[in-house]
Amino acid sequence: MKYIIAIIQPGKLDAVHEALGAIGITGMTVSEVQGYGRQKGKSEIYRGAEYVINFMPKIKIELAVETKKASEVIETIQKTAESGKIGDGKIFALDLKDALRIRTGETGSTAL
């Protein structure tokens, strides 16, 4: 199993959600987060004053999938979330040792 974490632009969430649903993904966790990468925030001018925004708003998507499905999920997120601009985000794939469905006690990939 793989645990996939994607950090994407907030405006891309609906498209990514729809695209993942189209390939059979039935669940994920979504969080509003803040962070920065190479762009290190940005400066904006508001009413003549310059403001530095150090942390950019992002969306974090987390999902657990069977190993054989991981490449398809990663490719789907990448293609859907890409705008070609700085700040598009990152995708991380980690090995997932086990999962447990609390309600039924199922473990492993059947718990997904």
Residue ranges and their predicted role:
Residues 1-112:
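Positively charged, small/polar-rich N-terminal and surface patches that mediate targeting and assembly
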